């Protein structure tokens, strides 16, 4: 369940979400029962204890509300405060954040007492403002900040906090954003140093939930056995996935000699064994693969043949003709070797399977070989030293790259006239003598788009508005 779910006048809460909420019962400031989403409550207690050490005492006046609860509150406000006040201060059913269980109306105890009504509550704004700087450390944001009414559609509510998780909360509060702005504007590239075990999809799913962003994708699958960089695009950065996927990739591979498996790696079943000859000329054989050739795709891969993935054929025991792809081995060198294994580094083009490369090398060596370890160390201009672990993300200690940092295109800052043209996808004269593609940014360093040369004119390739 995404903690960044957006509920407002334009985005009504769905019944499917309401069925999934895990609620727990606690007491509000009037000692009445109140329900709160479990993780939200756990972090609220941490915030409450932290503030208590600073002599600030807070309590909950409202949390989760059912659709029926919201209808009742709306009608009560209508009767007590009138239509004008109610429409600007109370959400109609299905559009209230309180349906999520993730938001809290908190009260501050002043002179030993909590406020008795809404009028008294509004007089305490200065007390609320003193705690805002602490919210993000516990995963909360001020949901309806001052000066953002045109974005949220709700008047400033100093008492209304919302749990989104520590990582999104830090980004939102540091950028002075609302939740709406975060979900629209936040984008970038996260480089994950994947450990052996999880699938690429597992990592994408983790990143998606940590940031609370659904629009997430990776730029080149790593097998479960493989390690190293998995480049993950978030938000608008997903527009450049195809660019990053097409970049050359560098790997370090470890190879075991004397046996082969059905999957070409040590995760598979052993098919054949052999003795290992002495004095294998591994270095020269590797060097002979510095070329372009047609490589056979391994049976254990996600490549489709007749609408079916190859690994599905393998698992069902059905025969299939394996397709071949043109690949280029740009660089390859021996790093180390012993009597039963060797390690090499290689730089290859898109679509090259290192497992298949090792099988081709083994045929030239005249000995069975199997990949025992694979580390992707570089993809395009992005290297492993720019990577993060999933724990780095969870600990809110990570580096996110901008779109332009991941591309090796020239960057041009344009004036307002050209800015208007770029944002509207207008063709431009190639007055900058661009040879391939160019990244356009405005004077505020905002990324506008990527243009490419076509018939000596510059035309839109990707627009980021």
Spans of features found by a protein language model:
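Accessory RNA 3′-end/elbow-binding domains used by RNA modification enzymes
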Residues: 186-195, 201-222, 226-229, 247, ...
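A common structural junction motif
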Residues: 137-139, 288-293, 363-370
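Extended alpha-helical targeting/anchoring segments
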Residues: 300-330
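Extracytoplasmic cell-surface/polysaccharide-interacting catalytic and binding patches
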Residues: 1-185
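Structural signature of FAD isoalloxazine-binding scaffolds in flavoprotein oxidoreductases
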Residues: 242-257, 320-334
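Acidic, low-complexity central loop/insert segments
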Residues: 243-294
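Residue-level signal for inorganic ion chemistry
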Residues: 232, 253, 307, 357, ...
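The conserved catalytic core of RNA pseudouridine synthases
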Residues: 206-213, 231, 320-351, 355-366
């Amino acid at each position: 369940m995404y903690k960044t779910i957006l509920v407002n006048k334009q985005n009504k809460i769905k019944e499917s979400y309401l069925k999934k909420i895990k609620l727990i019962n606690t007491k509000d400031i009037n000692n009445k029962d109140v329900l709160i989403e479990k993780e939200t409550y756990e972090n609220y207690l941490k915030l409450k204890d932290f503030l208590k050490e600073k002599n600030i005492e807070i309590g909950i006046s409202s949390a989760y509300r059912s659709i029926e609860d919201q209808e009742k509150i709306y009608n009560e406000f209508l009767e007590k405060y009138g239509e004008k006040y109610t429409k600007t201060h109370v959400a109609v059913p299905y559009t209230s954040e309180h349906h999520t269980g993730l938001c809290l109306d908190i009260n501050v105890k002043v002179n030993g007492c909590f406020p008795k009504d809404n009028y008294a509550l509004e007089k305490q704004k200065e007390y609320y403002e003193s705690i805002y700087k602490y919210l993000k450390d516990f995963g909360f944001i001020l949901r309806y900040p001052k000066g953002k009414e045109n974005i949220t559609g709700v008047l400033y509510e100093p008492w209304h906090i919302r749990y989104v998780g520590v990582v999104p909360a830090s980004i939102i509060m540091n950028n002075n954003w609302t939740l709406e702005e975060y979900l629209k504007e936040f984008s970038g590239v996260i480089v994950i140093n994947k450990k052996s075990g999880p699938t690429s999809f597992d990592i994408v799913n983790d990143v998606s939930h940590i940031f609370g962003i659904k629009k997430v994708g990776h730029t080149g699958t790593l097998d479960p056995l493989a390690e190293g960089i998995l480049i993950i695009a978030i938000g608008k950065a997903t527009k450049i996935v195809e660019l990053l996927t097409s970049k050359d990739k560098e790997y370090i591979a470890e190879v075991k000699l004397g046996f082969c498996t059905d999957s070409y790696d040590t995760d598979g079943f052993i098919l054949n064994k052999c003795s290992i000859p002495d004095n294998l000329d591994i270095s020269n054989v590797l060097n002979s693969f510095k070329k372009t050739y047609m490589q056979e795709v391994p049976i254990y891969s996600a490549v489709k043949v007749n609408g079916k993935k190859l690994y599905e054929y393998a698992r069902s025991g059905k025969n299939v003709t394996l397709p071949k792809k043109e690949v280029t081995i740009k660089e390859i060198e021996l790093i180390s070797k012993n009597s039963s294994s060797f390690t090499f580094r290689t730089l290859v083009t898109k679509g090259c399977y290192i497992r298949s490369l090792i099988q081709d090398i083994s045929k030239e060596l005249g000995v069975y070989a199997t990949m025992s370890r694979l580390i992707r160390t570089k993809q395009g201009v992005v290297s492993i030293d720019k990577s993060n672990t999933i724990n780095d993300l969870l600990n809110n200690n990570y580096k996110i790259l901008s779109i332009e940092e991941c591309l090796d295109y020239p960057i041009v800052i344009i004036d307002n006239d050209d800015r208007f043209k770029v944002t509207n996808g207008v063709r431009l004269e190639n007055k900058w003598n661009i040879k391939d593609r160019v990244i356009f940014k405005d004077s505020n360093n905002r990324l506008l788009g990527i243009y490419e040369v076509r018939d000596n004119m510059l035309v839109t390739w990707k627009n980021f508005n």
